[in-house]
């Protein structure tokens, strides 16, 4: 009988479990955060469910909750993917199979790079083009990103989830010059395989 009372109270009240503990406070939750051009796997699903649960709990406690999905959408893996696409991919296959095709050619890249290390040099060169704003490189990258987001949104829609921010790693690509200058001025950068590292 007690359990039924709790169930009835919960079903008939929209404020069950609510408080104003978080009034005038903001909390940011960064969750899900899948990698672009890769499958949405169980590890992403776990953090997605946990993050969304935390969002619901903090919202009920009166917090303003900012839901952040920090996508893995920038980095040398895109140089590898561009090389793979140009060597073994086709627009038709990517349009038809989406992320599955991108994963297939990415795996092919790694298999071939074990036999031919020059592929890694090509990949670094393509990523450098991306960083320098090369139109072709950025167009291919954006296409890969759009295909991935379409698939991610399909999953989020099934789960009934929304986010306040989808800004991924690429958001910061034009904001790092000041940080790099400071690291350079402080003597903290060194060159390694054509890249500057800390």
Which residues does each PLM region occupy?
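NTP-dependent nucleotidyl-transfer catalytic core
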Residues: 1-198
């Amino acid at each position: 009988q007690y359990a039924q009372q709790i169930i009835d109270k919960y079903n008939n009240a929209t404020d069950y479990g609510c408080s104003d503990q978080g009034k005038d406070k903001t909390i940011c939750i960064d969750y899900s955060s899948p990698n672009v051009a890769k499958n949405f796997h169980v590890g992403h699903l776990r953090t997605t469910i946990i993050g969304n649960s935390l969002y619901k709990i903090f919202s009920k406690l009166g917090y303003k909750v900012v839901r952040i999905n920090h996508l893995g959408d920038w980095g040398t893996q895109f140089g590898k993917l561009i090389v793979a696409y140009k060597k073994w991919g086709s627009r038709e296959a990517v349009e038809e199979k989406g992320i599955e095709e991108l994963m297939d050619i990415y795996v092919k890249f790694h298999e071939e790079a074990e036999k031919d290390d020059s592929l890694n040099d090509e990949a670094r060169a393509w990523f450098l083009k991306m960083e320098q704003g090369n139109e072709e490189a950025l167009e291919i990258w954006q296409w890969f990103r759009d295909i991935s987001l379409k698939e991610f949104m399909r999953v989020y829609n099934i789960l009934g989830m929304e986010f306040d921010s989808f800004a991924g790693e690429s958001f910061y690509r034009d904001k790092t010059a000041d940080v790099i200058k400071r690291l350079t001025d402080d003597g903290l950068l060194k060159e390694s395989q054509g890249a500057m590292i800390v």
